[in-house]
Amino acid sequence: MTRIVKAVARRTSLPEAGVGAVISLLDEGATVPFISRYRKERTGSLDEVAVRAVETALEAVRELEKRREFVLGAVAEAGALTPELKARIEEADTSTDLEDLYAPYKPKRRTRASIAREKGFEPLAKRIMAGRMARIDASEEAVEGACDIIAEWASETPRLRNMVRRAFSRDGFVEASAAKDREKELETSPYAEYAGFSRELRRCRSHQYLALRRAEAEGFLKLKYTISDEPRLVGSLCGAFGPKDASRPCRELIDAAVTDAYKRLIKPSVENETASALKEEADTVAIGIFSDNLRQLLLAPPLRGRRVLALDPGFRTGCKVVAVDEQGALLADAVIYPVEPRRDTGGGARILSDLIRRHRLDVVALGNGTASRETERFLASAGLPGNPQVYVVSESGASVYSASDIARAEFPDKDVTVRGAVSIGRRLIDPLAELVKIDPKSIGVGQYQHDVDQSRLQQALDYTVMSCVNSVGVDVNTASAKLLGYISGIGPLLASNIVKYRTENGPFASRSDLRRVPRMGDKAYELSAGFLRVP
């Protein structure tokens, strides 16, 4: 445990005492919102961002420890686990360092080096590496085989691999060129600006790299990773491998083998590592932006206590209109055709005016999709009773909600167009309560959201929703099961039980009444009670 605490503390730059407390609480089943709000005395007042960082780092560290145990076992089984190697494996702080140490003992496919070993050329390779041979008295095939073996040894040397990694990090470039036979298409594609693109890896912006990767995946571009002074790097690699006082014949063969190792084995491998690291870094930046965008949408100020006229605009199929009350309940629905092709502005104005008067509606929520601007101009000139203020509302994901099981359960007798318009109106009344019903990825939170690691994106967005819900808290007597499911310690099953109990027994009079809900144990109650409001 101490080893894990120290590793997490190093990764997060947080005090070991606080990190240890957070890990203990997480292992006891506590959630990030609960720890950051109600266990400050144990964590040294770490905030939610810090606690979340510990949770994320802990997962990575435990994965590394699991891999470390596997590597130790595999190397021991191979009979190669010396005390020195064991110490180096136990000290490896990153997965890259660990895999470098494991590389010589990892099961391999058939390679040039393995073929050379089968032919008995390894003793010659060892003599060349010793550097004492004044002349190489062996056949050309034997020398080539020995050099293949030496090249493999060089490629499995952590020091050489790290030299190449540092060179890519310091002097590496990513270059883009048009894919074969796609030059003309590239000129009219969204990626035209990236033709001939060349940028230092350390200066390549996350959105640029994601765009390059997308263009490569779609067949428009070919990407290449280069190092500015490759000959100097190869010379440094040769100088770092083999005995310093090797004879000239041995030195020439060792240098040739190292050069071959760099071009054939090390560089392609490190290129892949570099591309993966760049992608991971770009994903991290993009996912952070997407999470921030989602947080802003979820925490937009609610317009509670207002009765809303909501419109989902459209051209040919008309503008779907609903009236919803202060709680978001559907009062009435209609369809109007105020814009092209019908332009029935008079009929549309009469229908809206009637709905406003009959249901005492005082604000308008207008979806920002197709025909939104044209419909907004119509509303401005319609002369509606009371001149209600018009709010333009994002309708991203409304169509997803309208076809969901949740929407069908709420409005089994209404079609998807009515359900979508209701969602737009509810987003104005209480954005958080409505948007949690939709998969966060369907809300449309960023330009490259489909290019990043989808598992990481889903995890980050789900956490953002949970964080927002718990930062605001919910009214246990009005919250939907979907909203309750994000509360600390509850989850989908218990949320359904709460709603069912509330439906059968009436509103909760106090938090303690929650203990009567089936499956609401002491731990769940402890973790959730502070985030639930009972008016």
Where are these regions (language model features)?
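A short acidic Gly-Thr/Ser loop motif
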Residues: 29, 313-317, 519
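Duplex nucleic acid-engaging cores and interfaces of nucleic-acid transaction enzymes
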Residues: 34, 50-53, 60-310, 314-414, ...
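Long, highly charged, low-complexity intrinsically disordered interaction regions
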Residues: 4, 37, 62-80, 90, ...
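Short alpha-helical "packing" element that flanks the helix-turn-helix/winged-helix DNA-binding module
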Residues: 21-22, 498
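Feature marking long nucleic-acid-engaging regions of large polymerase/nuclease enzymes
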Residues: 31-45
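Active-site proximal loops enriched in glycine and acidic residues that flank catalytic Cys/His/Asp
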Residues: 313, 325, 334, 368-370, ...
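Generic start-of-chain signal for non-secretory N-termini
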Residues: 1-20, 27
